[in-house]
Regions:
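Structural beta-sheet core signal
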Residues: 32-34, 80, 116, 155
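Helix-adjacent hinge/juxtasegments
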Residues: 54-100
Length: 165
């Protein structure tokens, strides 16, 4: 099963994804693939908050760029947190659009159950600079790619999860 949970920043996506993946794991430790690179103190604090909430319930893998490689032969379930930060990393490291889309295609081919967490960035204004527009456009393409293939798609707003597929 492949599940997408999308929503705004601090909307409750991660909490819902963590609860769901634990249910899917049937008592085993699910894999938590963390994609964030610790580039500033504020981001470090966000990551620490996530680590505290997770505790010892997950097997954590930290990989900011090569997600499929980190998950090869994995016997899920896997929670990927989050594709928005991964996309940020990919653009920062100047991965081509083709490589970005191919990575998502490969993640969708994983045999194990996967929950993808991604911020919904397409509800605001069109950004005023090229890099921000590229980020928003690619994020939207990734969301569509996942939405088409995932068995279930959920939108989280104000801590409330709504299934939309």
């Amino acid at each position: 099963m492949k599940i997408l949970i999308t929503g705004g920043v601090k909307s409750g996506k991660s909490r819902h994804a963590e609860t769901r993946i634990l249910e899917m794991a049937n008592g085993k430790k699910p894999v938590y693939l963390a994609t964030t690179e610790l580039l500033d103190p504020e981001m470090e604090e966000r990551v620490l908050e996530h680590r505290r909430r997770r505790g010892e319930k997950f097997r954590t893998i930290e990989e900011p760029l090569h997600l499929t490689d980190a998950l090869l032969n994995m016997e899920g379930p896997v929670l990927i947190e989050c594709l928005t930060m991964w996309l940020n990393n990919a653009l920062h490291h100047q991965l081509s659009e083709k490589k970005i889309i191919t990575e998502i295609e490969n993640l969708l081919l994983l045999k194990c159950d996967v929950i993808f967490v991604q911020n919904e960035v397409g509800l605001g204004i069109i950004p005023d600079n090229l890099l921000a527009r590229k980020f928003a456009d690619l994020s939207g393409r990734i969301a569509q790619q996942l939405g088409e293939v995932c068995d279930e798609v959920n939108l989280c707003a104000a801590g409330i999860l709504v299934q939309i597929k």
